[in-house]
Amino acid sequence: MARVTDGIAELLGAAPEEIIYTSGASESNNLALKGIVQASRHVGKHIISTALEHSSVGGALSALQQQGCEVDLVDIRRDGTIDLEHLRELLRKDTVLVAICAVDSELGTVQPIQEIADILRDYPNCRLHVDATQAVGKTKLVLSGVDTMSIAPHKFYGLNGSGLLVKKKDLVIEPQIHGGGSTTPYRSGTPALGMAMSIEKALRLALENQNERIAHVAALNRLLRAELAKYPKVRFNSPENAVPHILNLSVNGVKGTAFQQELGKNDVCVSVKSACSVEGTLSKAVYAVSRDQKNALSSWRISLSHLTTEAEIAEFLQIFDRCYRELAQ
């Protein structure tokens, strides 16, 4: 286990003692947010986050609000990035946590983590948590100035049920699972060696081949954008500088669920909102960017990977054309 942990730490540019094994990013997010805030009671109870976060972050923040914490959401710009000036305005002496996703799961927007970390240098009692679930293998990870970072191995072809929390070694957080600490005092329970080995292998493959994989996916994304832009009712929600693995769009006048179901009849799988969102509600991420409820309800997401082929894109475009003619005309 020590050798595997050393390997994971080396790949991430972290120290072995900064690696905490969890059951997934949802647990990692809960451990980081609740652990940081509970350990910072003597400083304050003010938290800053965004409307773009995964439901495990939103759920943890709601639980902390019930315990007396105050949560402010920083404004989102039209390109999907956070408004850094608004962040500066929201920061207070009693702010103990800023929680931001590195890459938004619905739009693919890459947040300016380094700039955020630089701003927080003037607030030594405030910790920065980054949910990097959608970032590994898709963009460069920024650990400098980050106190905790959640990682979900199944997003880069590791196993479901495994997760990581990278925690700065001098940071003290409150554990959420109590008992005998096996590899860390911050998360009780003995990690599964097989799971840990799968994380290291998947992480190594993702990072060693990252540039080639990104270039392949970017070419497919450009092809999709060029072809889908020919349809007058198509509106792209993902910004141009998003990670190419995620392409969020809306077809005006057609609910995203309708398109999802019609494409599903042709064995094409697309997503409406994030997988862990409440069914029947609009996409908070798309609404935060577009400020348009109808557009948010019409949105859906295409996910690409280095395993996606041009032939699959061509087949998708043929199926999309049939669905568009049936639903949008």
Predicted regions and their residues:
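Pyridoxal 5′-phosphate
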Residues: M1-Q329
